[in-house]
């Protein structure tokens, strides 16, 4: 249970500090998003969020937290993480245009019960993002490989993009337990 090792979790902040500086030094005005286990310093447990950090201009900040925490099959995220209540929209000025980027983490996309046959979650980040009028949907995932899962992921992703009527940037892990 690496997520229970406080020093390991705290070390990721030092690595992010250095990575943000290195990226800025080498690439200048480049923005990068990464997934992290965000520590919350209070007396409640679990004291982590599954979060997205934005690295840019030599610094980093949290821009999104996971809303839907799966607890089925290989997933037991409620054991380690808190659930965020609100969707995250990052407003970026790029080449004289203002962009509203809606961020989701993995399961936050899986809200259409017709696709997979599972019950719909009580929370619906995709519906909430529609109210925020995002221009682009970004999903960071770390989904393990499963036979024929790519086809299902494509359907889920397509549903979200069509529902929001925006392009989707979908990023999944490689290596590790992705075979």
Give the ranges of each region predicted by the language model.
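Enzyme catalytic cores with a strong preference for nitrogen-chemistry domains
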Residues: 1-179
């Amino acid at each position: 249970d690496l997520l229970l090792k406080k020093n390991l979790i705290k070390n990721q902040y030092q690595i992010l500090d250095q990575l943000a500086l290195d990226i800025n030094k080498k690439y200048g005005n480049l923005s990068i998003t990464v997934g992290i286990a965000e520590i919350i310093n209070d007396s409640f447990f679990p004291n982590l969020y599954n979060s997205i950090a934005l690295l840019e201009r030599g610094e980093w900040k949290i821009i999104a937290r996971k809303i839907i925490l799966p607890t089925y099959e290989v997933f037991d995220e409620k054991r380690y993480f808190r659930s965020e209540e609100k969707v995250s929209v990052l407003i970026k000025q790029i080449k004289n245009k203002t962009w509203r980027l809606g961020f989701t983490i993995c399961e936050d996309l899986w809200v259409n019960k017709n696709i997979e046959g599972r019950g719909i979650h009580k929370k619906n980040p995709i519906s909430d993002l529609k109210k925020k009028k995002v221009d682009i949907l970004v999903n960071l995932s770390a989904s393990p490989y499963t036979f024929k899962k790519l086809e299902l992921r494509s359907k889920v992703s397509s549903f979200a993009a069509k529902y929001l009527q925006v392009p989707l940037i979908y990023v999944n892990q490689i290596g590790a337990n992705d075979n």
